[in-house]
Amino acid sequence: MEPRSSERQRGASRPGGYRTEHALAVDASARIPGFRPEPPRSLEELALPFSFVAELVLKIMYFNGNILGRDIAARACLPWSITSDALNFLASEGYCGTTGIRGTAGPGADFAESLQYLVTSLGRERARELLELNQYAGPAPVHLDDYLESARSLVDEAPTVARDQLREALSHLVVPDELVDILGTALTSRQALFLYGPPGNGKSSIAEACAGVLGDPIFIPHALYVHGEVIRLFDPVHHRPVSGPPLTHDQRWVLVYRPVIHAGGELRGNELELAFDRSLGFYEAPLQLKANGGIFHVDDFGRQMIPPRQILNRLIVPLESGIDYLNVARAGTTVSVPYATMLVLSTNLDPGELIDEAFLRRVRYKAHVPDPSADQFRLIFERVCRSQGLAHSSRAVEYLLERHYHPTGRPLRGCHPRDLVGQLVATARYLGVPPELSPDLIDRVCRAYFSDIRPSSTAHVGGNARTLN
């Protein structure tokens, strides 16, 4: 299919895509961001080659059989005027035809929206040729230039984080005041943050909660168009759409809450680069790009399959310059994109054995997440009991501390109340007795939870870093 001479040529005409359906809507409590993509009124505003659009529409029809015109437009997330042009072109080439009408067009709608379209045998042959190149058949991608405009607005319009706002976001956690203030200044500056300290004290929960103060929901594209290639950006695993009444906007974009992208010990080096899926024929965005506008949290730092230095070397340039460089190998080019995410590293290993001085300087904020004090432990225990519908007993908590902590010098961990109460409820259910903080149930749970196993300080660690106790 040859592009029209009047089309806006920004890149080679190459097919791409994946299948998805997404209705965009807004939670009544969520504020609409300043950047709001308007629906394209023409092919020029769409900024995609006409041949790409026509090929995308053909693949959508191929995968869906007999399909209404308006449903094709909805799946492609395109206005009917642009979809109609593509359908007329495909029909003139003998790739599709109409099989009848179903329903009626709404007020002001085009009659052709209610027509049913079906791919011809010639069209199926052409679609299979296109699918050998790539199998993308989802929402039309957004041109990289249009995405860059939105990403820059994330940097330019970053709001200041107020102390009361942060305290509210962390209200479900027990966090020392000094730590709250370090978090607040780091979030306001959007500079990298290193959380370190013993395991089980809420470093991951803190990172998750911090995303709530980064600002209003943001629009992100389903996918990007870069030099004829498609990069899938919206990820239902990591991005949470805002729900509510539908918005009038460019449907190629999704309104999502500020993302928190977690990467733990399973993180691999290729997840920080554009990943080309040979079976599908298009790219998957790297994790840090998916995290733009939110937080990229590398949890259990130092326990990945790749050395800490490799992760740091990959991210050091974006941290320093605010620009990330992505290699689009199939197009033979490298593109630059704004690095508009806040990097949060968390570990229970000794940071001094993981990071050299040069990188430590670039991670501007370092915060120690300590074990809770005895009073904080009691408060956490009370909150957990309340959340589990369990009657709280101060005397039972003192029994727990005196019997199972003080004699052995066992450290208090923020996760212990949740874990112990959860196991106590399960134990009571198994025994057929009421769940209560009785000495017998507490002793049973502690015998199962605590053990004589001495954890290794370097097990599954990329190096010989010490575990913090």
Walk through the language-model features, giving the residues of each.
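Short acidic, hydrophobic short linear motifs in intrinsically disordered regions
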Residues: 63-75
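Dynamic helix-loop-helix/coil hinge segments at AAA+ ATPase domain boundaries and subdomain interfaces
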Residues: 152-180, 390, 407-408
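Conserved ASCE/P-loop NTPase catalytic core
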Residues: 171-344
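Short regulatory helix/loop adjacent to the ATP-binding pocket of P-loop NTPases
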Residues: 350-362
